[in-house]
Structures are given as structure tokens and as C-alpha cells.
Amino acid sequence: MTLQIQFKKYELPPLPYKIDALEPYISKDIIDVHYNGHHKGYVNGANSLLERLEKVVKGDLQTGQYDIQGIIRGLTFNINGHKLHALYWENMAPSGKGGGKPGGALADLINKQYGSFDRFKQVFTETANSLPGTGWAVLYYDTESGNLQIMTFENHFQNHIAEIPIILILDEFEHAYYLQYKNKRADYVNAWWNVVNWDAAEKKLQKYLTK
């Protein structure tokens, strides 16, 4: 008897702004390739692997006909890639609406832990620039300690699942900057500060502070 099993599939979320809204800091061409190519690819990749996993669970595939480690590792990569990119789009705002400095509880925590926003920005930037290869620079709220923690994820295989309380995230894969900044990743990191959506970051933090 065939089991009636189906995993719900993922969908590509809409961009929260027009495709050219982050110019001149992040070009229209980069957003087009990044969103419609790479992010969409993670969604499609995850859904394809979920369909294969369905066949494994149902018993449609016999042992030796599939590589469970490969399926799960592929799901880890593609699902995290999808979720992290969704967060990345959300924490940027069009030119003129992003950048500057945070306010509210986020500013208070930054000042308490790092002394000033400028010092925090320096440490985050140095962290981003020190990342070997590809991955993400991340600011997350540690619900255990109450700290705003800066860390990096190499590739999409980070030690924590993507649902940790991420407040701010910077994509450092080459597809995020190479068309515009070539091999000058540090220039991209510096430009990114001009489109950071601090209002969105504050809302994310408030969600975790009130739990």
C-alpha cells in the first residue's frame, strides 16, 4: 500500500522593493541575477529534493536507489540558502531609506555591548572582510545570554539552523557583488551599509525581546 505523503513545497518570496531600488550601491543587474537566478535556484533545488525524499519515505525507492546523505545535505544547503536570502532581502531598503544608524532597543544594545555604533560597525565590517571564501556575516540575538552576537556562516552549512534570531545578515557569496565590485569585496561591504534597513532590524529584535 502506497503511503499518501507530501512535503509542502517552498515558494520564492517577492522582493520587498523594485529590482533597481538599491542602486548605486547594489546594481540592478546583480539583484536580477541574485534573486531570479540564485535565490530561485535554491527554492527549486529544495523542492526537487523534497520530491525525492517523498519517494524515499513512501518506499517508492529501494535501498541502493538513493543516497540519503546526499538528499539531506542538499536540503540543508538549499533550504538554508533560501531562508538566508529571504532575510538578506528583508534587511535592506532602497537608497535614501536605508543606511544611517539604528535607533530604539537595537541602538541601546549595540551601545551597551560595543560602546558605540561606530565601534560595532568596525567590528562587523572586519568580521565580514575576514570571512574565508564564501558565506555570510551575521548579527543575531542570543536568547540565552541576551547578547547581540556577531558571527559568520561559511557556505550554507552553518552549525545553527537558519531560524536562529538573525537581526542583520550580509551575503558574501561572489554572486552578491562580483558583477559590480569584481574582486573588491571590501568595497561591497562598505557600500552595503548604505542600504541597511534598521527599521526591519529593530522589528526583528523586538519580536525576540517580547517572547
Swiss-Prot record:
Q: Where in the cell is it found?
A: Cytoplasm
Q: Does the keyword Oxidoreductase apply?
A: yes
Please write the reaction equations for the catalytic activity of this protein: 2 superoxide + 2 H(+) = H2O2 + O2
Q: How is the cofactor bound?
A: Binds 1 Fe cation per subunit.
Q: What class of enzyme is it?
A: oxidoreductase
Pfam families found in the cross-reference section? Sod_Fe_C, Sod_Fe_N
Cross-referenced InterPro entries = Fe/Mn_Superoxide_Dismutase, Mn/Fe_SOD, Mn/Fe_SOD_BS, Mn/Fe_SOD_C, Mn/Fe_SOD_N, Mn/Fe_SOD_N_sf, SOD_C_sf
Chain positions recorded as Fe cation binding sites: 34, 85, 171, 175
| Iron recorded as keyword | yes
**Would you tell me the Gene Ontology cellular component terms?**
cytoplasm
Needed cofactors, names only, are: Fe cation
- Annotated Gene Ontology MF terms? metal ion binding; superoxide dismutase activity
Its Enzyme Commission number(s) read: 1.15.1.1
Query: Taxonomically, which superkingdom?
Result: Archaea
Query: Where does this chain mainly localize?
Result: cytoplasm
Alphabetic keyword roster: Cytoplasm, Iron, Metal-binding, Oxidoreductase
| Function of the protein | Destroys superoxide anion radicals which are normally produced within the cells and which are toxic to biological systems.
The cross-references to PANTHER family, in alphabetical order and at most eight, read: SUPEROXIDE DISMUTASE 2, SUPEROXIDE DISMUTASE [MN], MITOCHONDRIAL
Per UniProt, subunit arrangement is: Homotetramer.
* Family according to the record: Belongs to the iron/manganese superoxide dismutase family.
Under which name does UniProt file this protein?
Superoxide dismutase [Fe]
Per the UniProt record, the source organism is Saccharolobus solfataricus (strain ATCC 35092 / DSM 1617 / JCM 11322 / P2) (Sulfolobus solfataricus)
